[in-house]
């Protein structure tokens, strides 16, 4: 998942991921600096292996001030995990919903979600 701010960064991450898993699900959302793609959504709710995900850049949920708006939005959408960006700092808060910021691809940081038997596992990666 690409969480906004930089189409070039998304291409770099996609190449890295495709080498590991050619069938990986790739989704993106628009960030506050993605002026080139006005049709891209600001958030998505999707199902991955029986796990419900909320994907957002995070600026509309004001994640630089607090994660509580993000937490409430993910709960409203009945999501198990909320992935967000905007701060460009890796972060993971366990619970339901789990909150995950993979960091910044330009700093060679990302998170990988694996689901087995409906149980999610998130790994923070540096490449």
Enumerate the predicted regions with their spans.
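Short, surface-exposed charged micro-motifs
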Residues: 45, 91, 112
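Active-site environment of divalent metal-dependent phosphoester hydrolases
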Residues: 7-11, 33-38, 61-66, 81-94, ...
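Active-site neighborhood of phospho(di)ester-bond hydrolases with catalytic His/Asp-centered motifs
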Residues: 1-5, 27-32, 54-57, 80-86, ...
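Active-site-proximal segments of metal-dependent phosphoesterases and phosphodiesterases across multiple
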Residues: 39-77, 105
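Core catalytic region of metal-dependent phosphoesterases/phosphodiesterases
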Residues: 1-48
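A generic structural signal for ordered secondary structure
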Residues: 27, 94-95
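Binuclear metal-dependent phosphoesterase catalytic core
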Residues: 49, 72-77, 95-127
């Amino acid at each position: 998942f690409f969480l906004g701010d930089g189409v070039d960064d998304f291409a770099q991450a996609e190449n890295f991921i495709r080498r590991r898993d050619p069938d990986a699900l790739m989704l993106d959302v628009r960030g506050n600096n993605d002026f080139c793609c006005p049709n891209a959504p600001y958030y998505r709710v999707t199902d991955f292996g029986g796990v419900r995900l909320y994907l957002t850049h995070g600026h509309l949920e004001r994640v630089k001030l607090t994660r509580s708006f993000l937490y409430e939005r993910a709960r409203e959408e009945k999501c198990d995990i909320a992935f967000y960006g905007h701060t460009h700092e890796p972060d993971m808060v366990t619970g339901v919903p789990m909150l995950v910021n993979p960091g910044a691809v330009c700093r060679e940081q990302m998170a990988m979600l694996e689901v087995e038997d409906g149980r999610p596992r998130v790994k923070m990666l540096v490449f």
